[in-house]
Amino acid sequence: MTKALLKDLNARDAPLREQLEQEATSLPKIVLSERQFCDVELILNGGFSPLDGFMNQKDYLNVVENLRLSTGEVFPIPITLDLNESQADSLKAGDRVALLDPRDGQTVIAILTVEDKYTPDKANEAEKVFGANDRAHPAVDYLFGRAGNVYVGGKLQAVTPIRHFDFVEYRYSPAQLRSDFQRNNWNRVVAFQTRNPMHRAHRELTVRAAKQHGARVLIHPVVGMTKPGDIDHFTRVRVYEAILQRYPKGSAKLSLLPLAMRMAGPREALWHAIIRKNYGASHFIIGRDHAGPGKNSQGEDFYGPYDAQYLVEQYAQEIGITIVPFQMMTYLPDEDIYKPVDKVEPGTRTLNISGTELRRRLRVGANIPEWFSYPEVVAILRQSYPPKYSQGFVLAVPATSDKLLPSALVSALNEDGRRHVTLLPRLDAISVFYAQELQRAGAAVVVSLADADASVKVPAEWTTVNIKPKDSVSEVTFAVLSQLSDEGYL
C-alpha cells in the first residue's frame, strides 16, 4: 500500500521563517479560535494533506456536495476559516494576513494569502455534512452559534512552529511518526481513534485487530476539541500511558492528535481514515457509531450504528488504507474473555458497563470490576473524578435577618465531621477566587452574601441556600445538611 503524499508546510517553509516573521510585523492580524488553531496545526504539519490552506469556495462547495476537493481528491469535511463581517470586510483576494496563536494572541503561526471570501449556506452545510440542521448536534450548534458568517479561502505558509507544553513526548507530526515506523520496521500499523478513556474492551479489540492483520497498534487519541462534556485530555492521556503497559512489549505506540472533532459520524470516519493514512497507518479501526454525537432533538441517534463503516469502505481503496470494522466488544464472564457481539452464541451470558453507569459508579464511589477496567486505569479516573463525598462544594447564604446563619452552617458541618469547612464572610472577586480554589481542592465553603459586592455574580455551580421567611436557623441548617446528604456530598 503506497504512502499518501504528505504536504508538510512546516518543513517546506522552514528556510523562509526569518523572512516571513519580518513580513508578519506589518500584516493585518487575526487571532484564531480554538478550532481554527487545531485546523491550522494539522494543515501545517500535513495531517490534513492534500490541503495546504483553508478551502476556497469551489473546494468548499465540492466537499459539501460530493465529499471531494475540486481537484478530485476525497475529502469529506469542509476546513474553512470562518470570520465575522467586521474581520472579513477589509480583506480582498491577494491580501496577506498573519494568523495568531490564541493562547497568547501574539505569536504568528502562519500567513494566509487570501484567495477568496464567500458567504456559506449554513443550513445546507448542516444538512449535507452533519445529516441534519439540528442544534442538538454540537457541530451544528457551533456552526450557527459560534462560527463566523464569512469564509475566507487561501493557502498558508508556516511561520512559528506550534509548541505544546503537555505530554510533549507523544506529540508526533505525521513525518515524525512515519519515520519512526520505518526505523522500527513497522510496515503494518493499525490505528485506533478515541476521545474517551480506554478500558479492557478497547485493549482486547485493538490486540485482536493487530493479530488479524499482522500489524502493530497505534493508539491515536484526539486531544484537541472533542464533544462537550468529554473527559479532559490530561486525564485520558494518563489512562493511555497506563494501558499501554498492558500491551505485549513493542506492539503498540501512543501518539496524540491535535484534532478539532466535528462529530460528523460517517463523514468524520472517512476524514479520520485520511488523517491516519497521512500519519503512516496502513489500517484503521472503525467501530460502532464512530464519531457519533448522541441523540438528536427527537431523542433518536443522528446516525446508524454502522453507517460509518459502510461509507468508509466505499472509499478505502481510493484513499489507500484498509478498514478494520469491529462491532462492540462484550465480556463473557463464564470464559473470562471479550468477544465482538456478533461472535457471541445466543443465550451466552454477557456483561457490560455503559458509559453512563461508569460515570455513576465514579460519582458515588461504587466498585468498578477488574473485568471491565484495569485497577491502574480506575485509580486515575477516581483521582480526576472523585465521588461526591470527596468533591468540594460552595454554599451561598443569602442575606437574612439572622446574621449568624453562615456561622451556624459552618458549625453544623464541622460538628458532622465528614468535611473540612471554610467560611468566607463576604462575596467579592477575591472571595470567589478563593472559594473556587478551595472547592477544586475538595473543601466545603460557606459564603455569606450579606454585604455582597453588587458587581460580582454568584457562580452558577454554587448552591444557594433556600431560606423561607419564617425558617429558624436550626431549620435551615437541618434542611441544608439533609440536602447535602441526599446529593451524596456527606
UniProtKB/Swiss-Prot annotation:
EC identifiers of the protein: 2.7.7.4
Broad class of where this protein is predominantly found: cytoplasm
Reaction catalysis annotation: sulfate + ATP + H(+) = adenosine 5'-phosphosulfate + diphosphate
Matches recorded under InterPro entries: ATP-Sase_PUA-like_dom, P-loop_NTPase, PUA-like_sf, Rossmann-like_a/b/a_fold, Sulf_adenylyltr_euk, Sulf_AdTrans/APS_kinase, Sulfurylase_cat_dom, Sulphate_adenylyltransferase
Region Catalytic, annotated ranges: 166-390
GO cellular component, as recorded: cytosol; mitochondrion
Residues at which ATP binds: Q193, T194, R195, N196, G287, R288, D289, H290, M329
Region (N-terminal): 1-165
The keyword rRNA-binding is assigned to this record: no
Positions of post-translational Phosphothreonine modification: T356
SUPFAM superfamilies per record: Nucleotidylyl transferase, PUA domain-like
Secretion signal span: none
Site positions (Induces change in substrate recognition on ATP binding): F326
Subcellular location: Cytoplasm
Active-site residue list: T194, R195, N196
Amino-acid positions noted as binding sulfate in the UniProt annotation, renumbered to this chain: Q193, R195, A291
Pathway in which this enzyme or protein is active: Sulfur metabolism; hydrogen sulfide biosynthesis; sulfite from sulfate: step 1/3
Keyword line: Amino-acid biosynthesis, ATP-binding, Cysteine biosynthesis, Cytoplasm, Methionine biosynthesis, Nucleotide-binding, Nucleotidyltransferase, Phosphoprotein, Transferase
UniProt record similarity statement: Belongs to the sulfate adenylyltransferase family.
Subunit structure: Homohexamer. Dimer of trimers.
Record comment regarding domains: The oligomerization domain is distantly related to APS kinases, but it is not functional and does not bind APS. It is required for oligomerization of the enzyme, although the oligomerization state has no effect on the catalytic activity of the enzyme.
PANTHER family xrefs: SULFATE ADENYLYLTRANSFERASE
Role of this protein: Catalyzes the first intracellular reaction of sulfate assimilation, forming adenosine-5'-phosphosulfate (APS) from inorganic sulfate and ATP. Plays an important role in sulfate activation as a component of the biosynthesis pathway of sulfur-containing amino acids.
Descriptive protein name: Sulfate adenylyltransferase
Species for this entry: Schizosaccharomyces pombe (strain 972 / ATCC 24843)
